[in-house]
Amino acid sequence: MTKTLSYLKAVVICHGKSEKQMCDFIKSNLRIRIAVESDKKGEKSIQVTSVMKILNGRKFKTFQDFITTFEDVEICKIKTKKFLTDDFKIFIILDTDDCNEAQKKAFISKEMFRNHWAYRYIFPIYNNPQLESVLTKSHIKFEKRVMHENRSTLKFFLPTPNIKGEK
Protein backbone atom coordinates (compact mmCIF):
# COMPACT_ATOMS: atom_id res chain seq x y z
CA MET A 1 0.00 0.00 0.00
CA THR A 2 1.44 3.37 -0.99
CA LYS A 3 1.06 6.44 1.14
CA THR A 4 -0.33 9.57 -0.47
CA LEU A 5 0.83 12.99 0.56
CA SER A 6 -1.50 14.90 2.83
CA TYR A 7 -1.67 18.48 1.62
CA LEU A 8 -3.14 21.50 3.34
CA LYS A 9 -6.77 21.65 2.16
CA ALA A 10 -7.77 25.16 3.27
CA VAL A 11 -6.88 28.25 5.22
CA VAL A 12 -9.60 29.72 7.43
CA ILE A 13 -9.35 33.36 8.48
CA CYS A 14 -11.45 33.83 11.63
CA HIS A 15 -13.18 36.94 12.98
CA GLY A 16 -12.39 36.27 16.63
CA LYS A 17 -11.94 33.81 19.45
CA SER A 18 -15.30 31.99 19.10
CA GLU A 19 -14.88 31.44 15.35
CA LYS A 20 -11.31 30.25 15.95
CA GLN A 21 -12.54 27.86 18.65
CA MET A 22 -15.15 26.46 16.23
CA CYS A 23 -12.58 25.97 13.44
CA ASP A 24 -10.06 24.37 15.81
CA PHE A 25 -12.80 21.98 16.98
CA ILE A 26 -13.62 21.00 13.38
CA LYS A 27 -9.93 20.66 12.48
CA SER A 28 -9.21 18.46 15.50
CA ASN A 29 -12.30 16.26 15.53
CA LEU A 30 -12.62 15.74 11.79
CA ARG A 31 -8.84 15.59 11.32
CA ILE A 32 -8.89 17.91 8.34
CA ARG A 33 -5.66 19.56 7.21
CA ILE A 34 -6.57 23.23 7.53
CA ALA A 35 -4.68 26.25 8.82
CA VAL A 36 -6.69 28.45 11.17
CA GLU A 37 -5.59 32.10 11.06
CA SER A 38 -6.73 34.87 13.38
CA ASP A 39 -5.37 38.10 14.82
CA LYS A 40 -3.47 37.46 18.07
CA LYS A 41 -4.96 33.94 18.42
CA GLY A 42 -8.49 35.35 18.26
CA GLU A 43 -7.90 37.90 21.03
CA LYS A 44 -8.25 40.76 18.53
CA SER A 45 -11.15 40.54 16.11
CA ILE A 46 -10.89 40.93 12.35
CA GLN A 47 -13.61 43.14 10.87
CA VAL A 48 -15.03 43.29 7.34
CA THR A 49 -13.43 46.73 7.13
CA SER A 50 -9.96 45.38 7.97
CA VAL A 51 -9.86 41.97 6.26
CA MET A 52 -7.91 43.40 3.30
CA LYS A 53 -5.12 44.38 5.73
CA ILE A 54 -4.79 40.68 6.55
CA LEU A 55 -4.84 39.67 2.87
CA ASN A 56 -2.26 42.33 2.03
CA GLY A 57 -0.10 41.33 4.99
CA ARG A 58 3.07 39.23 4.82
CA LYS A 59 1.36 35.79 4.68
CA PHE A 60 -1.16 36.49 1.91
CA LYS A 61 0.17 39.47 -0.09
CA THR A 62 1.59 37.50 -3.01
CA PHE A 63 1.38 33.92 -4.21
CA GLN A 64 5.07 33.49 -3.34
CA ASP A 65 4.52 34.82 0.20
CA PHE A 66 1.60 32.44 0.58
CA ILE A 67 3.43 29.28 -0.52
CA THR A 68 6.42 30.28 1.61
CA THR A 69 4.18 30.59 4.69
CA PHE A 70 2.01 27.56 3.95
CA GLU A 71 4.65 25.15 2.62
CA ASP A 72 2.42 22.07 2.65
CA VAL A 73 -0.13 23.42 0.17
CA GLU A 74 -0.53 21.45 -3.07
CA ILE A 75 0.73 23.30 -6.13
CA CYS A 76 0.10 22.43 -9.75
CA LYS A 77 2.12 23.68 -12.69
CA ILE A 78 0.90 24.59 -16.15
CA LYS A 79 3.93 25.18 -18.35
CA THR A 80 6.00 27.51 -16.15
CA LYS A 81 3.15 29.03 -14.12
CA LYS A 82 2.35 27.73 -10.62
CA PHE A 83 -1.17 27.59 -9.16
CA LEU A 84 -2.96 26.25 -6.13
CA THR A 85 -5.19 23.30 -6.99
CA ASP A 86 -8.87 23.97 -7.62
CA ASP A 87 -9.68 21.99 -4.45
CA PHE A 88 -7.87 24.50 -2.22
CA LYS A 89 -9.99 27.14 -0.44
CA ILE A 90 -9.48 30.24 1.68
CA PHE A 91 -12.53 30.64 3.92
CA ILE A 92 -13.02 34.00 5.63
CA ILE A 93 -15.49 33.86 8.55
CA LEU A 94 -16.58 37.33 9.68
CA ASP A 95 -19.44 39.05 11.48
CA THR A 96 -21.39 41.65 9.50
CA ASP A 97 -22.57 43.76 12.44
CA ASP A 98 -19.59 46.10 12.36
CA CYS A 99 -19.74 47.44 8.79
CA ASN A 100 -22.08 49.40 6.57
CA GLU A 101 -24.39 47.80 3.99
CA ALA A 102 -22.06 48.52 1.02
CA GLN A 103 -19.09 46.90 2.79
CA LYS A 104 -21.25 43.92 3.75
CA LYS A 105 -22.37 43.42 0.12
CA ALA A 106 -18.78 43.78 -1.16
CA PHE A 107 -17.65 41.09 1.30
CA ILE A 108 -20.49 38.65 0.60
CA SER A 109 -20.22 39.02 -3.20
CA LYS A 110 -16.37 38.80 -3.09
CA GLU A 111 -16.17 42.18 -4.85
CA MET A 112 -13.70 43.49 -2.24
CA PHE A 113 -11.26 40.70 -3.15
CA ARG A 114 -11.46 41.20 -6.94
CA ASN A 115 -7.89 42.51 -7.34
CA HIS A 116 -6.23 40.03 -4.98
CA TRP A 117 -4.23 37.12 -6.45
CA ALA A 118 -6.25 34.64 -4.32
CA TYR A 119 -9.67 35.85 -5.53
CA ARG A 120 -10.65 32.50 -7.07
CA TYR A 121 -9.80 30.62 -3.85
CA ILE A 122 -11.61 32.97 -1.42
CA PHE A 123 -15.01 31.96 -0.04
CA PRO A 124 -16.60 34.43 2.39
CA ILE A 125 -18.67 32.99 5.23
CA TYR A 126 -20.63 35.62 7.06
CA ASN A 127 -22.40 35.67 10.41
CA ASN A 128 -25.44 37.90 10.11
CA PRO A 129 -25.17 39.90 12.27
CA GLN A 130 -22.83 37.84 14.52
CA LEU A 131 -22.03 34.21 15.41
CA GLU A 132 -24.40 34.19 18.40
CA SER A 133 -27.38 34.89 16.15
CA VAL A 134 -26.38 32.20 13.67
CA LEU A 135 -25.97 29.58 16.43
CA THR A 136 -29.35 30.54 17.92
CA LYS A 137 -31.11 30.29 14.53
CA SER A 138 -29.40 26.93 13.93
CA HIS A 139 -30.51 25.61 17.35
CA ILE A 140 -26.91 24.99 18.40
CA LYS A 141 -26.53 25.28 22.16
CA PHE A 142 -23.83 27.56 23.48
CA GLU A 143 -22.76 29.34 26.63
CA LYS A 144 -21.69 32.96 26.55
CA ARG A 145 -18.71 33.78 28.75
CA VAL A 146 -18.20 37.47 29.45
CA MET A 147 -14.50 38.24 29.71
CA HIS A 148 -14.92 41.97 30.38
CA GLU A 149 -17.26 44.83 29.47
CA ASN A 150 -17.12 44.71 25.64
CA ARG A 151 -15.71 41.22 25.09
CA SER A 152 -17.21 37.79 25.42
CA THR A 153 -16.50 34.35 24.06
CA LEU A 154 -18.81 31.47 23.29
CA LYS A 155 -18.53 27.87 24.34
CA PHE A 156 -20.40 25.57 21.98
CA PHE A 157 -20.49 21.95 20.85
CA LEU A 158 -21.55 21.23 24.40
CA PRO A 159 -21.90 17.56 25.28
CA THR A 160 -25.46 16.29 25.02
CA PRO A 161 -26.83 13.81 27.53
CA ASN A 162 -26.73 10.21 26.31
CA ILE A 163 -29.96 8.52 25.37
CA LYS A 164 -30.47 5.30 27.30
CA GLY A 165 -28.61 2.46 25.66
CA GLU A 166 -26.11 4.68 23.76
CA LYS A 167 -22.49 4.99 24.70
Where are these regions (language model features)?
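Helix N-cap/beta->alpha junction signal
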Residues: 15-16
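C-terminal accessory helical subdomains adjacent to catalytic cores in phosphodiester-
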Residues: 1-11, 20-41, 45-167
